Every structure is written in structure tokens, then in C-alpha cells.
A protein has these predicted regions:
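Conserved SAM-binding loop of SAM-dependent methyltransferases across substrates and taxa
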Residues: 1-6
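A structural micro-motif
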Residues: 7, 29-31, 84
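Conserved SAM-binding motif I beta-strand of class I
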Residues: 8-13
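S-adenosyl-L-methionine
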Residues: 14-47, 51
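Glycine-centered flexibility motif
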Residues: 36, 55-58
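C-terminal substrate-binding/active-site "lid" region of AdoMet-derived donor-dependent transferases
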Residues: 45, 51, 58-109
């Protein structure tokens, strides 16, 4: 936000304790905190973003890819432009792992 390129940040966090812990360190920035489960949060129709990044998973597991697909479906309507970006923590790694799992399944079963 301080660089002039980013005008605001919205954080959706399930834990109010985490918000209370982190927010004082960023009070001078234009950050909006929403205490909610991002998987259940219903954004307003006019809520639009240039960049969305999700890192809600406590561990790295290919099961997370299903959540990523669901989030992409929900949030695609909230992209500010066609070039707006949706990213996920460890997505590329998990996609590669899924390919390896599929190769293993077909080879040994």
C-alpha cells in the first residue's frame, strides 16, 4: 500500500484472534479486515479485486486442490478486469504432486 501501486488490501481471516494480533502492526495502511471463513463468505456483487491470493490451508496436501477450484468458481465474478489474478499457496507444487499420484495409481493398481 505504501508503494502507491496498491490502494487497499482486504483480508478475510477466520480467526478474530489473528486479526487482533496482526492488525496493530499495519494500522497505518489501508487494510480492511473481515472476520469470516473465506469458504463461506459471500462477497457483495460490486466487490472487485485486481489480485486475490488464498493461503488458508494449514498443510500442503493435494486435497486442497478441490478447495482451490471452489474458490476460483466463487471469486471469478469478483475480478476487477479479465487480467485480474487469483493465486493460491502452493498450487503449482500441488498440481505436480497430483500428476505424480496419478502416475503412481495407474502404475501399481
Amino acid at each position: 500500500v505504501k508503494n502507491g501501486i496498491v490502494s487497499s488490501i482486504t483480508v478475510i481471516e477466520i480467526s478474530q484472534d489473528v486479526i487482533d494480533l496482526v492488525s496493530p502492526y499495519y494500522k497505518d495502511l489501508n487494510i480492511k479486515y473481515i472476520c469470516s471463513d473465506v469458504m463461506k463468505y459471500k462477497p457483495a456483487k460490486d466487490e472487485k479485486y485486481d489480485t486475490m491470493y488464498f493461503d488458508i490451508w494449514p498443510d500442503i496436501c493435494t486435497d486442497n486442490l478441490d478447495d482451490m477450484k471452489r474458490l476460483s468458481y466463487i471469486w471469478r465474478y469478483h475480478k476487477k478486469t479479465a487480467d485480474s489474478w487469483i493465486g493460491y499457496w502452493q498450487k503449482d507444487y500441488l498440481l505436480e504432486r497430483r500428476k505424480q499420484e496419478k502416475r503412481y495409481e495407474t502404475r501399481y493398481y
